[in-house]
């Protein structure tokens, strides 16, 4: 997977040698999940996609510990024909079916940013065809100012996705990378949008989590705004963390109505956040692997689409 954060060239690595990936996975049985992402891996034709997926399910490679494969893509929103009428649509879906037949879970992590993206009839057909393979479709999107910073938009998206057989998964906070300032939504506003949207859907759509920041220490969720000892604070918790012991643990940050990202926040009731090293102001050179570029699930390996 490409590093998602700028100014960290040492964290960027990529290879098109699938044997390297297979060898790594064979040596690391603790890895149970592989995420194919990018970029958008569904830009790849079926022969290239097969070159990555087939070795993961080939019993000769001894990768029985791989339980799930995920494909992160926005192609359902901008190119649903990829799964319906394109020349290799049938072959792609056949490949999905082979992953399912191997006994593994296959999840298409579909990005939809607005309800309008769910309207085309060809999308409904694409969703039906993917689900017919046995794959599941989980949906996620960033909160984008002037595009979807409205509870009604998210309510409609989640309801429609459930009706179509998709599973709402994440509302993300816009990453602090690139020229994203115009689209950034303050965390306080993002929490209000999420809460109001969440209140208007049934339990079937409440599989969704957010607003979540995929930051360097891990995935950080904004759980609310409250007062503690007379101080207004954000309540947050780690959905995923470099240190697994921090997962699920709540912590506080001083309320800032303009804060848009984790690095905009200041700890309160402590001199540091739980994920910050206690002994070092910076990560020392002898611990180069402490803060990789993108937080994943426990036992997960992310593979770049090349």
Over which residues does each language-model region extend?
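Short acidic donor-binding/metal-coordinating loop in glycosyltransferase active sites
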Residues: 39
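Canonical Radical SAM [4Fe-4S] cluster-binding loop centered on the CxxxCxxC motif
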Residues: 1-13, 71
